[in-house]
C-alpha cells in the first residue's frame, strides 16, 4: 500500500488536495491552539491527531500555539501538561512553542486600526447591559448609547483602558458591525476587556486582554496558517473570523473549516463538569484513570498508539454523533493483546495446598506471549502451596463450568494437572483452603493415560507471591449519556473503582509505571504511576479481556 493510499480520507483532506492541485497553496500549515486553563481530554486528542496528522502526511507544518488571552484562568502547569500530552501522543510541533501573547503588541495595533476606520468603539455599558442589549435569537439587539463616539474619543478611551484608567468591567472595546444581524456573534462583539491580573508570559505589562475571536484569526494570519480547523461550535464564529481579517491590513487570510467534536459514551467532556468531579472529590484528580483526560487515560494504561488508532477509526465529519465507549476500549484491547507480555496475578485469592507435592518447589517455563515467540519466556516459581482465584473453584458445578470442582481435575497454567479432594472452611462457612493432589507426570503435557482435562486456571506460588493492590477501574458513569441527566453526579457508577488485595508472580516486582501486562484470564493492567511503592505495587486495570458492558446495553 502506498503512502497516499494509507492516508485517511475526509472532507478536510479533500479540500487540502484541491487547494494544492489548484495552486491556491503550495504547502500546508495547520495549528493546535489549546487554552492553557485545564488538562487535555480525548476530544482534544482528535484535534491533535487531525492537525498534526495532516501536517505530517502533507510534509507541512503544525504549530502548537497556546491561546493565552485570559490570565485569570491560565497557568504554566497546564502549558507543561499540554506539551507533554502532545509529545506523548507521538507528535512534534514546528519550531518553538507559540503563544497568542507573543502577538499582544500587534493585536493592540490592529485594534487601533479598527478604531481609526470607525469599526470599533469603547463601550461603557456593564457586562449585564451588554447581554441585555444583544437581543435574542428571535429579537434583534439594540445599539449601545456609546456606539457613535468619535474616532478621537475612542482612541483616547482605549488608551485609558490600556493604562489602567478604568476598573474591571467598566469599559471594553467592541467591534462596530450590526446589532440586527441574525448571527448573535456579529452583534458588536467585544474585542478587548480589562483584567488586572498577572500573565504567565507577559507579567504585568498589560491590563487589557484581547478576546478569543479577535486573537484567533489574527494569530492564524501572522503564522501563515493555511487551514484553520475548529470544531462545529465555532461555525458561526467564522463570520467574525473573516470580518476581522477583511478589515485590517494583513497580507494573509486563512480559511476556517469546522468538523464535529468528539462525544463519547459513559463520560463527560465539559470542562466545568470535569472540574466539578475533581473539586468535589468524586475522582482523585485530573489524572484519575476514570477521567477522559489524556493524563488519566495514560495512567490507566492506554497507549498513544491506541488513541491515535481510535481517532483514525472515528474519522472526521461535519455531523455530530456519539461514539460508543466500546470503540475506544476495542482499540486498546487490540493493541495490548498484540503487544503486552503475559503475567499471572490472583485478584481474589484463596489458598490451595497440593498434599502429595514433594520438595521445596521448582521453576516452570512460561512464554511471555503465546503467539510471539520472539518475546521470549520467563521462569516462574511453582510450589506445593499456591494461590488461585476464588471464582475458579466450586464445590459443585454444572457441565458448563470448566474450572476446578471438588472431586474433579483442572490444569494449572503451564504446570500440572490437579484434583480437588477436600476443603477447609472458617466459622462463617467461607472456604479458607482447598486441598488437592497432582499428577506429577503432567508438567506442561497431557496425562499419559489419555484422560481429557479441559479447564485451565492461573495461579501464583504462595511462597514467592508478590503482594499487590489491584484497582479494578470501570466506566465512570452508569448510563451512556450522563450529561443528559438532571444531575450528572447522580449517575456516577458506584463500582467505577473496586480495590482488591491480591498476589502476583514475582517477576512483576520489576514492572515500571505505564508498562502494560495481560494478567492471564483477567484483563490488561499497568503499574500505577502515583500510588505504587517498591513494598506494595499497585496495578490499574486498563480494560478487561472482553466487553462486559455489551449485554448491559442490549
Curated annotation (Swiss-Prot):
GO cellular component, as recorded: cytosol
Keywords: Aminoacyl-tRNA synthetase, ATP-binding, Cytoplasm, Ligase, Nucleotide-binding, Protein biosynthesis
Family annotation (SUPFAM superfamilies): Nucleotidylyl transferase, Ribosomal protein L25-like
Superkingdom of this protein's organism: Bacteria
Residues annotated for ATP binding in this entry: 35-37, 41-47, 231, 261-262, 269-271
Motif ('KMSKS' region): 268-272
GO biological process assignments: glutaminyl-tRNA aminoacylation; glutamyl-tRNA aminoacylation
A Pfam family assignment: tRNA-synt_1c_C2
Gene3D superfamilies with a match to the protein in the record: Glutamyl-trna Synthetase, Domain 2 (1.10.1160.10), Glutamyl-tRNA Synthetase, Domain 3 (3.90.800.10), HUPs (3.40.50.620), Ribosomal Protein L25, Chain P (2.40.240.10)
Protein name from the UniProt record: Glutamine--tRNA ligase
Gene from which this protein is expressed: glnS
Amino acid at each position: 500500500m502506498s503512502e497516499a493510499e494509507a492516508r485517511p480520507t475526509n472532507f478536510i483532506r479533500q479540500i487540502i488536495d484541491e487547494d494544492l492541485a489548484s495552486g491556491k497553496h503550495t504547502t500546508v500549515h495547520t495549528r493546535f491552539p489549546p487554552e492553557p486553563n485545564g488538562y487535555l481530554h480525548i476530544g482534544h486528542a482528535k484535534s491533535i491527531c487531525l492537525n498534526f496528522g495532516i501536517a505530517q502526511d502533507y510534509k507541512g507544518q503544525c504549530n502548537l500555539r497556546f491561546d493565552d488571552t485570559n490570565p485569570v484562568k491560565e497557568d504554566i502547569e497546564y502549558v507543561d501538561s499540554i506539551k507533554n500530552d502532545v509529545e506523548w501522543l507521538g507528535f512534534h510541533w514546528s519550531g518553538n512553542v507559540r503563544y497568542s501573547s507573543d502577538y499582544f503588541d500587534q493585536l493592540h495595533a490592529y485594534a487601533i486600526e479598527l478604531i481609526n476606520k470607525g469599526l470599533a468603539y469603547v463601550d461603557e455599558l456593564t457586562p449585564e447591559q451588554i447581554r441585555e442589549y444583544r437581543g435574542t435569537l428571535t429579537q434583534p439587539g439594540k445599539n449601545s448609547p456609546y456606539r457613535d463616539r468619535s474616532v478621537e474619543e475612542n482612541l483616547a478611551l482605549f488608551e485609558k483602558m490600556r493604562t489602567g484608567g478604568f476598573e474591571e468591567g467598566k469599559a471594553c472595546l467592541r467591534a462596530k458591525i450590526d446589532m440586527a444581524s441574525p448571527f448573535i456573534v456579529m452583534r458588536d462583539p467585544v474585542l478587548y476587556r480589562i483584567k488586572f491580573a498577572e500573565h504567565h508570559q507577559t507579567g504585568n505589562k498589560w491590563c487589557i486582554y484581547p478576546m478569543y475571536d479577535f486573537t484567533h484569526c489574527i494569530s492564524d494570519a501572522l503564522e501563515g496558517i493555511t487551514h484553520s480547523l475548529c470544531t462545529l461550535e465555532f461555525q458561526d464564529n467564522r463570520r467574525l473570523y473573516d470580518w476581522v481579517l477583511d478589515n485590517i491590513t494583513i497580507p494573509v487570510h486563512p480559511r476556517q473549516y469546522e468538523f464535529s467534536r468528539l462525544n463519547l459514551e459513559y463520560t463527560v467532556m465539559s470542562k466545568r463538569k470535569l472540574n466539578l468531579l475533581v473539586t468535589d472529590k468524586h475522582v482523585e484528580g485530573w489524572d484519575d484513570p476514570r477521567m477522559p483526560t489524556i493524563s488519566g487515560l495514560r495512567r490507566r494504561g492506554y497507549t498513544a498508539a491506541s488513541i491515535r488508532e481510535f481517532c483514525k477509526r472515528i474519522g472526521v465529519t461535519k455531523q455530530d454523533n456519539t461514539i460508543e465507549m466500546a470503540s475506544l476500549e476495542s482499540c486498546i484491547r487490540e493493541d495490548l493483546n498484540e503487544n503486552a507480555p503475559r503475567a499471572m496475578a490472583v485478584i481474589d485469592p484463596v489458598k490451595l495446598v497440593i498434599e502429595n507435592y514433594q520438595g521445596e518447589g521448582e521453576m516452570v517455563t512460561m512464554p511471555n506471549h503465546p503467539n510471539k515467540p520472539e518475546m521470549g519466556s520467563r521462569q516462574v516459581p511453582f510450589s506445593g502451596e499456591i494461590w488461585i482465584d476464588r471464582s475458579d473453584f466450586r464445590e459443585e458445578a454444572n457441565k458448563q463450568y470448566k474450572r476446578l470442582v471438588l472431586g474433579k481435575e483442572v490444569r494449572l497454567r503451564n504446570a500440572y494437572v490437579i484434583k480437588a479432594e477436600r476443603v477447609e472452611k472458617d466459622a462463617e462457612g467461607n472456604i479458607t483452603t482447598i486441598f488437592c493432589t497432582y499428577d506429577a507426570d503432567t508438567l506442561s503435557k497431557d496425562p499419559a493415560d489419555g484422560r481429557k482435562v479441559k479447564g485451565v486456571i492461573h495461579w501464583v506460588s504462595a511462597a514467592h507471591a508478590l503482594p499487590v493492590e489491584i484497582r479494578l477501574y470501570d466506566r465512570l458513569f452508569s448510563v451512556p449519556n450522563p450529561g443528559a441527566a438532571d444531575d450528572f453526579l447522580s449517575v456516577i457508577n458506584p463500582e467505577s473503582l473496586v480495590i482488591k488485595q491480591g498476589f502476583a508472580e514475582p517477576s512483576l516486582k520489576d514492572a515500571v509505571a505505564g508498562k502494560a501486562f495481560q494478567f492471564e484470564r483477567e484483563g490488561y493492567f499497568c503499574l500505577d504511576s502515583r500510588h505504587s511503592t517498591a513494598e506494595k505495587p499497585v496495578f490499574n486495570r486498563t480494560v478487561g479481556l472482553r466487553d462486559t458492558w455489551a449485554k448491559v446495553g442490549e
